């Protein structure tokens, strides 16, 4: 069974934690990770971009001049794309970019991503992330103690002290276990869990 040391916020070892191999030491299926990230990013798209075509732009539908006898190319109306102020030809219209992935595959992708981080030794477990007060400096000192830079923090309980202390720190994101997602796991170079958060994630990702 996979194991990790448990530290306090000053990086003093306070124990060990056994990890569920099915969650943190599973086979890494990169194709599933890629698919899950692609779907999450696609589902973020608003798809509301739109331009006016010749049917929507304001203006008369009257023929600008007669069909024959002027020596000019025939024209249908002033709303045509070749005219200034005319409609756009083949421009973007609202579109639904949403894709779906079944729950079993989503969980498998998250397990693969966490297993990849575990095998890279990029997971840190702490007994608690309670800070005495809201101070960005105190949170930065915790990151410095663990030599962490681009970090995703998963904490078991909503702690305004931690969230407010971390808010102004670049390349750091604080989430609860229910907010754990494939894009953020892959975006950040390391993940810090509290002990309780590890257990909640294991419970949520059981196959």
UniProtKB/Swiss-Prot annotation:
It comes from the Bacteria. One of its GO terms (biological process) is translation. The keyword Cytoplasm does not apply. One of its GO terms (cellular component) is ribosome. Keywords: Ribonucleoprotein, Ribosomal protein, RNA-binding, rRNA-binding. Residues 62-85 are annotated as: Disordered. It holds the Pfam family Ribosomal_L4. InterPro entries: Ribosomal_uL4, Ribosomal_uL4-like, Ribosomal_uL4_dom_sf. GO terms for molecular function: rRNA binding; structural constituent of ribosome. One of the primary rRNA binding proteins, this protein initially binds near the 5'-end of the 23S rRNA. It is important during the early stages of 50S assembly. It makes multiple contacts with different domains of the 23S rRNA in the assembled 50S subunit and ribosome. Belongs to the universal ribosomal protein uL4 family. Part of the 50S ribosomal subunit. This is Large ribosomal subunit protein uL4. It comes from Citrifermentans bemidjiense (strain ATCC BAA-1014 / DSM 16622 / JCM 12645 / Bem). The lineage of its organism: Bacteria, Pseudomonadati, Thermodesulfobacteriota, Desulfuromonadia, Geobacterales.
């Amino acid at each position: 069974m996979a194991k990790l040391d448990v530290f306090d916020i000053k990086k003093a070892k306070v124990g060990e934690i056994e990890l569920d191999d099915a969650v943190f030491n599973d086979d890494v299926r990169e194709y599933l990770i890629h698919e899950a990230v692609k779907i999450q990013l696609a589902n973020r798209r608003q798809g509301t971009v739109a331009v006016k075509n010749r049917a929507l732009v304001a203006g008369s539908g009257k023929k600008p001049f007669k069909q024959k006898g002027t020596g000019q190319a025939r024209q249908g109306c002033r709303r045509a794309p070749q005219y200034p102020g005319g409609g756009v030809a083949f421009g973007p219209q609202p579109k639904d970019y949403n894709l779906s992935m079944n729950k079993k595959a989503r969980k498998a992708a998250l397990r693969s991503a966490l297993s990849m981080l575990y095998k890279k030794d990029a997971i840190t477990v702490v007994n608690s992330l309670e800070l005495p007060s809201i101070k960005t400096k105190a949170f930065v000192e915790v990151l410095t103690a663990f030599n962490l830079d681009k970090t995703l923090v998963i904490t078991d309980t909503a702690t305004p002290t931690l969230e407010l202390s971390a808010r102004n720190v670049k390349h750091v994101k604080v989430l609860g276990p229910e907010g754990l997602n494939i894009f953020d796991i892959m975006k950040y170079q390391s993940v810090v869990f509290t002990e309780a958060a590890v257990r909640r994630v294991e419970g949520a990702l059981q196959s």
